[in-house]
Amino acid sequence: MVPSIHKTSNRYRTIYFFLISLLITSTFADQQAWPLPEEVSASQLHEIPVLHTAFVQIGEELHYLNHPIRPENVHQLPVYDSIKGVCEGNCPKEANKNHATKTFNVLKLSGKGKLPMEMDPPMMDFGQNSVGTAQKRKIYIRNMRNEQIFLDAVVVNSIEFQASYFEQYKLEPHGVTSLEVVFLPREIGKRSTIVHFYTSVGVFTYKMQGNCDSNPYRISPFTGYRLPMNSSISKPIVIFNPYAYTMRITEIGTSGGNAHIELPHEVDSKLAEEPLQYWDIRPYQSKQIATLVLVGATSENSTVFVRIGSEIYLSSEHRKPNTDIYLTVPIEVLKRRGVYATDEILDFGLIRQGMKSEAKVFSVVQYQIGGRLEFETLYVEKGDHTAIYMEFASHPPIIVYPPTKGSVTLGPKADLVKVYLEGNRVQMSPQQQMKHISGHIIAVSRGGNYNVSIPYRADVFRGDLLPIGNDLSIQEDLRPPHQRIIRIENQLPFDVAIFNITLAPELVSHFSVRLIDRTALIRSGHISPVFVLKYNKKLPPTFDNSTIYLHTNVSTFNLSLSTYTGRMNVELISVDKNSFDFGFVERNDTRTIRFVVWNHNRAEMRLKNLAVPHRSAYRLYEVGVKSIGNFSDVRNDERLEYVEATDVDIPPMKGKIFDLELKVPSDGVVRNGNIIFETDLESKIFGVTYQVSTGSLQSIPEEICFGQTFPSKLVYRTLQVFNSFDEDMTVTRLTTLNEDPRFFFEGFDPKNPPVLRSGRLTNLGRVMFSPSAPCEHDYCYLGLPLGSSDGAWFTHGLTLPSNLPEIDSYLYKQLRKKYDALVNSGKHHINTTIILDTDKAKNIKIKTSAELVWPRLLTRNSIHFPLTALGNFTIVNLTLANPTNVPVAIQVIPLVIYPDAESLVELMRPNLVSELTDHVEMNETLMFSLRDTELFTLKSDSPVPKLREAFEYHLNHEMPRYNNEINIPRFTLSMILKPHMKIRLRLGFLPSDYTLRSSLLLIRNNLTAIEPVVMYGKGARIGVKVEGAEARSKKPLLFEIRHDHLTDCNNPKRLMHKLHSTLTVRRPFQVMNSGEVQFTVTNMSINGVPCENRGFRILNCYPFRLQPNETYALDIAYTPDFLTTTNEADLQLYMHMNGSAWIFPLASTVPGDMLAKCHQALPRPPFENIMYYSCVTALIFCLVCVLACAYLEGDRAIAVAIRQQFAIPRHVFDLNNLNKNNSTTTPVPTVPSTAKPESSIKKPTPATRPSTLRASSDAWLISRLLIGLANFIVKCVHLFWKWSLFWRREKADDKQSKSAKVTKKKNPVTMQKVEEFRQMLEYVGQQKRQQNSGELAPEFDEVEEEELAEMWAQRKDSGAQSSVVTDPEPPMSKSQRKKKRAAQQKENNNLEAPIIVQPVVQSPPVQNKMEPAKKTTPGPSPKPKGNNQRKKHVQVPPVTKTPVTPKTSIPPPTEPEKPIKPSEQKKPNAIPVERPKQPTPSKARTPSKTPSQSNRAQHPASSPAPIAPTSAPTDDFVHVPPTSLTSPDLFYRQFLSSMGMPMDAGMWDTPAAQAAMPFMNLWNYGGPLSAEQMEDLIRQASGVAPITNDSEGTTVTTPSDIGMTWGTSGHLGGDEESIGGEAAPDWIDEDVNVDDAEMDFSSMSAASKDIFKDDDIDNFNQQMKRQRSPSQASSTLSRKLENSPQKMGSRRLTIGSEKKNNQSSSSALNPNYDFTRTPGNPNRMQMSQNSIQPAPPATSIWGDNSNSDPWGTNTVSNPLSELEDDPLSLSHLGINLASTESSATGPMFTMFSGPEFNLWSSSSLFHPPTQQPSTSQMPQDTDNENDEKNN
């Protein structure tokens, strides 16, 4: 008892641990505790259509697992340890281990006595079973041992096999127990599994198997449902009654859980008062009995079982219980969001081949996505999907909407696509009767995040139920009543049960039918009598046919019942339709006439005893059967001969084709006869005749071959016939043997038939062949019209969607399948016969042949790029042509830009003509590229964009189907090819490595759908070797020159240079192409020099080409120079495919001991003597030039020394004495205004010439020639020397501007004097350069400049006024105040002591009669104007001239005002300036008339009289000498007189006077001096008493001719090109201090630079930083402006040009002043003197004056003699200013006439109008001009 208790406790303990392990196993089932089978990968788990559910059962507990269990994974299950307990330690450990782990195969070991347990049966075979029908069997287990065996567990790893637990878990010795196993198949096919029994003695493997066929109740396969949480789905339960009796449903139940059953009504039949017959299913009918609702309440993966109980009603009283029907529904409830299908499968059921199924809708819903989804891509995954046809349920993209807000259920259902199965597209082999089709349809959302798939299945069968013979054919003459049994043949692949038969309504009154048995079962392939047909009433004559319906368990079949006449129709394919007339034939000739016997009845017709009249002459052949309207059913190469009389059956509605052949006997005997066609109802007789003649009709060529063609292509051949008969014949018919409509004849007119002339060759025209003429199904294997459904898919693919591979593959296979079927049937070879009939010879046969092929737009099946070196680009040109007669739409796409290229390669690989390599390029865009797309740069005239746009326009605008939605990508080549149009394609290949690569060029088109072209390319290596050495090798190509090569160096003739040949060594080098690709050497050079350099020379220096492993001899010669022992160079070879050169080093060696000797032996160059003598001549010439230059330099040095000898000694320089005599005027005699000055006539001025040598009159001729030659050389050198001075001066100026000089600190006043003096010198020098063509004025160093400036300033101060009343200072602008503060700060830093300037008193202005008084407008601050600044047009009235002070070089204009206060006079460095009042706009345009103007208007003809000042001078001006500094002549006189110079008549001829003249032209004081004034000044400077002129004097110094016109000029405001036409600058009225001069000049220079040359701003600022003087800055700027006269002409107005259109003031200088006139004694001029009137001194520095005589004179003396050769002229003094012209055309001189002020006015200012009006006409002209401007 104790041992038993111990065993029991061990057993329960083991069970306890076993249950715990099962719970753990089931808990972690979702975590893949059970690994998958080897043949199923984890990635394919979601694609498994069946949800497999395994289970482990222990006792009555059943645990389902998510994945199948493999046997090797269950060994760790706990096993009862009962044996160990029995042994109690006596058993060895090995025995316990073996008992626990040993495995027994029951099937192999059964019956051999080796099993501890025997199982009966050893293997369970369930046999044949159907889906949904369960079979239950028992397995018996017997204990073969004498000990107990514990049965632990049963493990089954299949969901289709179930097992119960053992009836007894403890098996006593020799005891027996059992368990039940159930087979419930879910899918069709064989199923098997292994069951594992875990026991205490080991594991037993037991095999179970079964076969599953289709379910008789037509239950669809259970593929399982997937649905989200909190959702439900409904599945209708439809049951088919496969029995011949009624089946009643008695019970429906489910296994519970998430499945519920909904009956058709809410309550049961009793409460609804429905009869029980509602649940009856009639025989062979289907009925929905309930609805299965699946609810996703909990997340699980389980299986729902539905049991349906039924019974069979054999009669109303007899019932037979039926087996239960089990529906197994796997269900998986998921928590994840996504898209779910509403159906588990699209089941099409049984589809007959050739028919189209009903549409199945693929619908989806979304769950917890939150936004709407768009689907536009659907495709069929794998498998044979040619029979699946899909149509979008709505216009794509199809939107799947989310559920309403706040809802947790599924969203609304959205229909994606309608799916059809087309049975006519299913291909079967002749032996195959049924084909199972299945697969998956996948819908892809935009972005690819949410995809959904649904499986589909269908069974397509072939066959029908057909009546036998004429059982259902009623002859018209048959009279009722008549009864017959109808036999049916079952040609279906399965058995058929016919349970009912019905008639069409129109047959009910005439016929009656009844089945022979309750259910007629017809086995597959058998014939059985089915029903009895009774003919009760005669049919009307109009009756043709009707239908009888057979109701079977498969479907309803239709049988046709018809009437027939039994008559036949014999059609002869000949001209004569009533007899077989062969016409003229030749002996031993063979002719054939084809005829067709048509059976137009719906019943089979039999011809009886069909035979020919004479076997010796005639033969009868059966060709085939032809359908009505079909010409392609007959093959001419297969014929059956009828040897004897035979009965021939002709099928209904068809015709049988026969050939009657005539073989003319050799003896020429004519054997005519008859052919009889006889049936049961009628007979016909046709005669057979022929005539024997000599001759024949022969076609040229004998056989017409059309070659390869295809639909949409038209081909033609010319038909010619030679007539060898003796007489002419007329062609009566030209046709084909089968009357094929694809052949037609051009040029044959039956109304005007051609005549075949005897013995001639006649052209009968062209025979045309168009394969697509009838366009039947078999032959129209090409073309996708854009308006068709398939064409819409092609058009959709133009936008390159993601499912493009599926679209193209589908379209291609649809077309290709038709062609393959045509090839398989042999119909692609067309062999027909053309029949030629004439009036005499008939049925002449001409054979024709053609072959239908698959066309190609690209003539090449593959493209092989040549070997291409790495880094190079190869382009191949291809021709793409449209070979058809219709337009073809194309789209060319490289594989690298094709979407999902890998899928396309897999789909198209079986259809490729050439195989792809292992390396298919799909990523690198440039490796295989299409160069003619808009992805690359195209030429401006490229038609590619226009062709693409035309294609888009055709689709979007001319085809409303696409609704303007097609947008073709630009990186594809898309267009419409017109018929026979050709285009050129450029394909590029750029290798990246040396591997052979391949790719595809895809030509999408609506002719063949897609045309793939394989491209091959491989990178090649480039290699060049020269003499076996690689490029850049360290081993050079050596020229080794030895002693034996240099033996000729000892040749005496060579040492004497009598031999002109040189030593040259030549060596050939072998250049070998060691690479894989040919190359061309385009250029060769040595160290960068073509062909020859450094002594090396390539003899055959021209391009050459080398193939791989080919060599070329390159000859290189070396000519040593014997300077070094070694010489090195680089040989450079340039190739067409490589930009860089291949470099090979060259080297040469020469023995060192031979260098000197061989170098001495080298030949001299032939030009050595010529060069020698040329050099000697050049040296002599240079020596002569040097001597001439020395002479010129000495001459200049003497002239400079003479000038320095007469230099002015240094004196104290006082600025206060400059304007003492400025306030008085000196009366000057005047001349009549009508006198015309002769000096105004332009006279040539002799240029300055160098001193020359003179020969004596008695000198020899040779001496005179040498002296003349020397003078000529001096003149030439002088000309060059003169221009070199300019160049050297400019270089010096540039150096001076660039170098920063350190100058010592000087007194600012002295610096200002030096600056003013330097400006005067520069101005004089500029005038000399303009006159003397570039001669320079004398230059001074700083010391000399300071001394001369002191003396000049003292003389200037001596005539200045001692006391001056300053005007009040006008208010200053912000910029002026800022400038003044800067100047004061600079002055405070530089001045040692303040300098007080005495104020200057101004006299009231005197208005000129000739010019109205105007008020000036104060301008803005002196800011430079930009180029884009608007120019102001304001009239500027004249202002009085102000005396000049040395504080500034350019003081502003002033007008007299009241004296300022003494407090204001103490301001240092301030120059008083009068600021005129601002005029009103009306006054600016129309100035008021003054009294002088009114007087002038009253006396227009009178000459102008001098104008007296408005107020008399004060007492301060009485003691002042009469000479006024406002007159240039008087100032020169005073200046020279104060210098102590002699004033006698001959003093101007002295060298001192000539040397002093360059310093006299002081432009700062308004104008040049007259000759008398200059004479007085020179006398004063020489120590002679000056001649003073007072009011009573008789000797009057008159000014030059400019004095007359300076103030009376009529051009002061009229001409735009004159200075008078210029408006006063904006800075004319601003206060200018002494220290502001530099800033004023800087502003002027900066403005000019900004206007004319922006690039000079930086240089100018740098120069200003170096504190250049204003004269230097302005001179530099003037030189730059002189070098760009075009800029001056275009921008004449710069500073102060804002008022250019106003009438200018009277500040214009007189243009008639002759500046080259020599100031001498009055005897040199003839002059008239008039009364002298004083002139006011208030003149502006700008030349503006309010008096008509600013120089103190109102008359001018005109010179009467020419002064050009005068020794005192400025020309003889070395001063040649601007050339003097006449008063009408002479240059006008102003203070702005120098280069310093070219920035302000154009050079055209100095060229006034050609005609100078008279003085009497000036006022009127001036008024006219003023009026014009005012208007």
From Swiss-Prot:
Residues 1480-1497, 1669-1687, 1702-1733, 1742-1758 have a biased composition (Polar residues). Coiled coil: none annotated. It comes from the Eukaryota. GO terms for cellular component: endoplasmic reticulum membrane; membrane. It is a single-pass type I membrane protein. Residues 1223-1234, 1394-1407, 1435-1448, 1500-1514, 1808-1820 have a biased composition (Low complexity). Residues 1-29 form the signal peptide. Residues 1338-1349, 1822-1831 have a biased composition (Acidic residues). May interact (via PapD-L domain) with collagen proteins (via C-terminus); the interaction is direct and is involved in assembly and secretion of collagen. Belongs to the TMEM131 family. This is Transmembrane protein 131 homolog. It comes from Caenorhabditis elegans. The lineage of its organism: Eukaryota, Metazoa, Ecdysozoa, Nematoda, Chromadorea.
